[in-house]
């Protein structure tokens, strides 16, 4: 019987092994439930939409391209997790904030406080906060969606001010 695995991004060692046919999300939720040590887990590109990651220790994990929309990250430790390339690594503490559904797509807006600044993921947009603010102004202006995004941006800025914007 073949199995699927979560490996350490740095050493390549198997951190958790799941049953054949399990999605990464299912395997990760099972690993968290069994209190597996997932520090440094290679989760790049994983579909973790609406996953229950509450309480997980994902310090130093590779989250490049992972879909975290709607995921429960309550009490999850994401310090030092890698968002990839130009976006840097998450700071220690509370680097993640999510709100929604909102905007023209009625989707979740995610923000990450990294060592290089605040990164936003909203729909197909992934970029720094300043670029997101400009895109919202250009696309939505003073419409209801624009106003809703503006309020979310204020919350994101406050969250970053409280929890350690670099």
Task: Specify the residue positions occupied by each region the protein language model found.
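Extended, small-residue-rich solenoid/repeat segments and analogous flexible loops
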Residues: 1-67, 161-166
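Charged phosphate-binding loop/patch that engages nucleotide di/tri-phosphates or the phosphate backbone
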Residues: 147-166
């Amino acid at each position: 019987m073949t199995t699927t695995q979560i490996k350490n991004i740095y050493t390549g060692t198997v951190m958790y092994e799941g049953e054949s046919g399990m999605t990464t999300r299912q395997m990760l939720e099972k690993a968290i439930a069994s209190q597996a040590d997932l520090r440094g887990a290679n989760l790049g590109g994983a579909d973790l939409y609406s996953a229950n990651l509450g309480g997980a220790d994902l310090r130093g994990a590779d989250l490049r391209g992972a879909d975290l929309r709607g995921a429960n990250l309550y009490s999850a430790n994401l310090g030092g997790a890698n968002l990839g390339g130009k976006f840097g690594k998450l700071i220690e503490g509370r680097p993640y904030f999510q709100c929604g559904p909102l905007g023209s797509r009625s989707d979740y807006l995610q923000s990450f406080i990294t060592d290089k600044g605040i990164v936003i993921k909203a729909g197909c947009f992934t970029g720094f906060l300043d670029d997101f603010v400009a895109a919202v102004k250009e696309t939505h202006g003073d419409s209801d969606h624009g106003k809703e995004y503006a309020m979310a941006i204020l919350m994101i800025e406050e969250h970053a001010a409280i929890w350690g914007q670099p």
